[in-house]
Amino acid sequence: MQKGNIGVTTENIFPIIKKFLYSDHEIFLRELVSNAVDATQKLKTLASKGEFKGEMGDLTVKVSLNADTITISDRGIGLTAEEIEKYINQIAFSGANDFLDKYKDDANAIIGHFGLGFYSAFMVAKKVEIITKSYREDAQAVKWTCDGSPEFTIEDVEKADRGSDIILYIDDDCKEFLEEARISALLTKYCRFLPIPVAFGKKKEWKDGKQVETNEDNIINETYPLWTRKPVELKDEDYKKFYQELYPMADEPLFWIHLNVDYPFNLTGILYFPKIKSNIELQRNKIQLYCNQVYVTDSVEGIVPDFLTLLHGVIDSPDIPLNVSRSYLQSDSNVKKISTYISKKVSDRLQAIFKNNRKEFEEKWDDLKIFINYGMLTQEDFYEKANKFALLKDTDGKYYTYEEYQSLIKDNQTDKDGNLIYLYSNNMDEQYSYIDAAKNRGYNILLMDGQLDVAMISMLEQKFEKSRFTRVDSDVIDRLIAKEEHKEANLESNQREILSSVFRSQLPQIKKVEFNVETQSLGENGAPIMITQSEYMRRMKEMANIQAGMSFYGEMPNMYNLVLNADHKLVKQVLTDAGNSCKAALEPIESEMANLNNRRKELQKAQEGKKTEDIPQAEKDELNDIEKKISDETTKKQAVLGEYANGNKIIHQLIDLALLQNNMLKGEALTNFVKRSIELI
C-alpha cells in the first residue's frame, strides 16, 4: 500500500467544495456519470483506430445504491497507478484549487459548474474510493482511497474486468442521495441523452398486485437523441413525439427548426415554437442547453437573444464556455456568433413559412404574434427581417402585412395634414359602437389586444413615416381622422355653460377618474352623448403598467371627455327645459354677474400699462372683491342648475348610458339605472 499527499495548499478541500457549491450538490452525479461515459467513448475510439483489440462487450455505465454508498461503474479505458497519480492526485485536485480560487466570489453564476469533474464527488461524500483496471494488457488493478483531506492511499487489488468503479460513501447530511427516487430524477435530468447506455437498477413490472424487479437493466437514457440525427431521416411525427417527451404537459408546437452547423462553431439542436400564452415570464427557461449530450442548464440568457428564450427545445454545443460567469458570455466571440446564427435561422424559418404557405402562417399568427413582436421590440436586426412577414389583424379577422395595410387605408384614412391614421380597438365587445361608427365611415379598424401591442404601437409610429395610431374610442368619429377644420357647435357661451353645468353636476364620483364636459356638433343622427379618452394620456398610463420609469403617469387620474351632441333632440330638449325651468332663478344671478363683469373690465382697462406699485390700493381691493363676488355668483348659478339636473331623468339616463357603454356603470348606480329604465318604459 502506498500513502501520499495530494499536491494542494488547502488543508481539507472537501468542506470548502461543499460550502462553496452548497446549492448545486446534485451535479456530482452528472460529473461522475459523464466521466464514465467519456472513458467508455475513449475505448470505442481506440478500438476504431485498432489500438484496442480486446472484446468490447457490454459498455453500459451502471449506477447502483446500497445502504451507505453510490457506485458509478464503467467498462471504459480504466486507469493505471501512474495515471491515477497524474490525473487524480495532480490534475484533478489542482484543477479544484484553481476553480475555487478563480470563482469563489461568483460561485452561483458559473454556467452549470461544468468542468468540476471528479472532485465534485466530495460535495456529497465523506470518503471516495476508485477501483480501476486499465484496458492495457497485463494491467494491475488498483484501489485509491481519500477522505477529502490531502492524504490518500493507493494499493493493488484484484479486479476481473477493465474499467472503473467510483464508490462514494455518502455524508450524513446528504442522505437524500441514497434515495432511489432522487437518483432516478437526477439521472433523468442530467443524463437522459448521454451517448452511452446508463443503467440504474432493473426494470420493474406488475406481478401479483405489486411491482417486482425483472432481470433487465433499467436504461435511463436515449443514446441517439433526435437532434443528433439528420433532418432527412426524420418525419413530423418524430419531432412532435420528441417535444412531448421534453414537455409532457404542453400543447403541440406550431413548428420547429433543426439546427446543425459545424463551422465556424459546433452547434446542434431543435428549437420549437410553442403556443405562447399571454404571460411571457411563464414561457422562459424552456430551452435546455447540453454539452456533448450532457445537460447543463435551462437558463440560456446570454447564449440566445432574449426574445428567443420564449422558444422551447434543445441546443447542444461544445463551443459555449461553461466554466465562466454569465456576464463573460456576452463578450465571448463564439457565443455571439451562435446567438446571431440562431436568430437568423429563426427569422429565415418564419420568412419561409410566410412565403410558401401564407394560409398556414395566418392561422398560426395569433400564437406567434407575441413572440415576433417581442423580437421586433428588442432586436433591431430582427425587426429589419420580420417587418416583411409580421402581420396586422383587423376586427373582421383579416390579416395584412405592414405594406399591404398601408395600401389598404391610405386613400380613406389620411387626415388633412397628410398623416396616415391607423384606427385600432383593444376590446371589440366594449368598443363595439365606436367600431361600428368607424366602419360606417368606410374605415378599417385593427385589433390590437395583445400583451405587447401598446409598446408595438409606439415603436411602429416611430418606424412608419407620417403615421399615427389612434384607438377608436379616443375621440368622436369626426375627429378621429380630421379631414377638415373642426366646426364647433352653434351655441352661445351661456348655452354651453348651462349644458356643461347640468351634466357635470350629475356625474358620479369615481376613484382616480376625472371628466371634462364638452359640446360638439355631431349631427342629428349621431349619439346624444359619448365618453372618449385622449389617446396620449391613456397610452402613457398603459405604458406605465409595463415599463419602468413611467410611474408618474400611472399615478395620474384617468381623464375622460363627456361629449354632448348639441344637434341631438334629447340634448336640445335638456337645454330648452333647463333654460325655461331655471329662468326665474337665474335672471337675477346673471344680471348681477353681467354688472360685475362690466365693472371688472373697466378696472382692468384702467390698469393696463401700469406697474403694480402705481395702481391705487383701493382699485386693487375692489378688483379682488369683484373676483370673489363673481365666484360666489357662479357657485349660486351652478347650484340652481344642479338642483334642476338632479330631478331630470333624461340627464341621468344619458350619463348612465354613456357610462354603461364604457363599462363604468357598476353597483348601486347600475341598479338605479335599471329601475329608471323600467320607469321610463
Name these PLM-found stretches.
Residues 1-172, 176-177, 185, 587-591, ...:
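GHKL (Bergerat-fold) ATPase N-terminal catalytic module, capturing the glycine-rich phosphate-binding loop
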Residues 110, 128-151, 171-175, 181-681:
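GHKL/Bergerat-fold ATPase module in large chromosome/replication-associated machines
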